[in-house]
Amino acid sequence: MKKKPFYKVLYVQVIFAIIVGVILGHYYPALATDMKPLGDGFIKLIKMVIGPIIFCTVVTGIAGMEDMKKVGRVGGKALLYFEIVSTFALLLGLAATHILRPGVGFNIDPATLDGKAVASYAAKAHGQSTVDFLMHIIPNTMVDAFAQGEILQILLIALLFGSVLAHLGERGKVVTDFIDGLTRVLFGIVHIVTKLAPIGAFGAMAFTIGKYGVGSLVPLLKLIGTFYLTSVVFVLVVLGTIARFTGFSIIRFVSYIKEELLIVLGTSSSEAALPQLMEKLEKAGCSRSVVGLVVPTGYSFNLDGTNIYMTMAVLFIAQATNIELTWMQQLTLLAVAMLTSKGASGVTGAGFITLAATLAVVPTIPLSGMVLILGIDRFMSECRALTNIVGNGVATVVVSAWEKELDRNKLRQALTGGGEVTTTETAGV
């Protein structure tokens, strides 16, 4: 097959678009901020099909399961994995901030901080108890769940729908076949929309640099550098070790999903690449049923980048305002962060709202301290989203392996660039 010219390769186009966006934002900030609708429009096009794709993928996956106990088993294994890896992410963020101490030397007086700029985030975070979160998973109506794009609500509906179809067996085959056909149509739409990724990445990056400016990064470069370094260490060491024990290379896996990562980099939203990631994971040998359950659930329960960010940001604010946290307070912070990080969607700004919810239960640190990182949160959002999507991809491969539903031949072919295969070699770790 004839190789594509490099300028027609999607990830090359996205890289070029990001570079052009940065240049425009730096030299023509007023014009660059007007590019925001390009990024917003691309994300809206992707979000338009996320709900239906999750519904169809989960329904067909569950309907094809002969043993309904398997649904609970896969979900249980996924949640166990999420909790273990999330805890590592939270601890790594805490440890890195203690070692590198990015907030030391700021000597900020908490009384001089104006909390008005972060009041809206605090308001959104206030009062979100565990009960509220669980009740929110239940939609008012089925239509409302799709209209609002609530992933967990759609997942609940799909689980019920798929379970009933599995119970009906042959009597439900017509409906299952229809939904399977609809899935193919939806992924066809995603392929069309993905071609617009360079435009979306350009618009989002131009707006970010134009509005906030590269200069806004300078005073807080140490925090940004600490966060990016910690995230890289997490991916290479923590996820890399998990990948190695599962039988694949984290470097090759990251290379395999590079187009999705660049879309996320340009838009700062891991949701922007959700449909493409699901398709890539299936092509890499993960079973549809596992992909359909693990990926959507991971977007609320397995946000590794957000976990690193939360403990790091809280400790940074404490260091910058010269507030000493006891070990008991830090353990409380970890426990609270494990709860507040669940349900945070992979969209831009969600991490900041989650941070507000975490700070609200650590009274010794002023909520107004969030002002210190408000200006750079948008630049840290990219790294959060990138870490989140890699984490969810690895989680899906691992759970597929645990379930002995990982086609290792396909995985090997995909990660080495050998193309698709037709033989099936299903095995677990």
Swiss-Prot record:
Gene3D superfamilies: Sodium:dicarboxylate symporter (1.10.3860.10). The lineage of its organism: Bacteria, Pseudomonadati, Pseudomonadota, Betaproteobacteria, Burkholderiales. The keyword Transport applies. This is C4-dicarboxylate transport protein. The keyword Transmembrane helix applies. Responsible for the transport of dicarboxylates such as succinate, fumarate, and malate from the periplasm across the membrane. GO terms for biological process: L-aspartate transmembrane transport. Keywords: Cell inner membrane, Cell membrane, Membrane, Symport, Transmembrane, Transmembrane helix, Transport. SUPFAM superfamilies: Proton glutamate symport protein.
